Amino acid sequence: MSRPSRLQRQVLSLYRELLRAGRGTPGAEARVRAEFRQHASLPRTDVLRIEYLYRRGRRQLQLLRSGHATAMGTFVRPRGPAEEPGDATAPGTRLDDGGAPKNSCEDTGARETRSDGR
């Protein structure tokens, strides 16, 4: 087996640091393990994605160490009865009766902001 690269050593170090930092925080260890397992199959050649995830992990480590974090978890959007796992519509949209995407803000009376901020 070849020697781990510098980036691999950094990722493993981050993993250990996150596990240590999350010891007293409910859900932290499970969240860290799940996140690392989810991305374990990334190809070694996808360096940009690995570096991005590494930087994101560093920021999460800073938050854990700051003492402001009381728990770690994930927000999962529950699937509605009409949604399929491979549904191509964007989050926050659903299909109207004609099959066209319908914005969920239309029913609530909330205004949808345009990309230019108006």
Curated annotation (Swiss-Prot):
Regions that span the bilayer: none
Region (Interaction with SDHB) residue spans: 53-65
Protein origin, superkingdom: Eukaryota
Main location: mitochondrion
Signal peptide: none
Record keywords: Chaperone, Mitochondrion, Repeat
Record region (Disordered): 68-118
Renumbered ranges of motif LYR motif 1: 14-16
Motif LYR motif 2 boundaries: 53-55
Subunit structure: Interacts with SDHB within an SDHA-SDHB subcomplex. Also interacts with the iron-sulfur transfer complex formed by HSC20, HSPA9 and ISCU through direct binding to HSC20. Binding of SDHAF1 to SDHB precedes and is necessary for recruitment of the iron-sulfur transfer complex by SDHAF1.
Function per UniProt: Plays an essential role in the assembly of succinate dehydrogenase (SDH), an enzyme complex (also referred to as respiratory complex II) that is a component of both the tricarboxylic acid (TCA) cycle and the mitochondrial electron transport chain, and which couples the oxidation of succinate to fumarate with the reduction of ubiquinone (coenzyme Q) to ubiquinol. Promotes maturation of the iron-sulfur protein subunit Sdhb of the SDH catalytic dimer, protecting it from the deleterious effects of oxidants. May act together with SDHAF3.
Family: Belongs to the complex I LYR family. SDHAF1 subfamily.
Protein name per the record: Succinate dehydrogenase assembly factor 1, mitochondrial
Gene: Sdhaf1
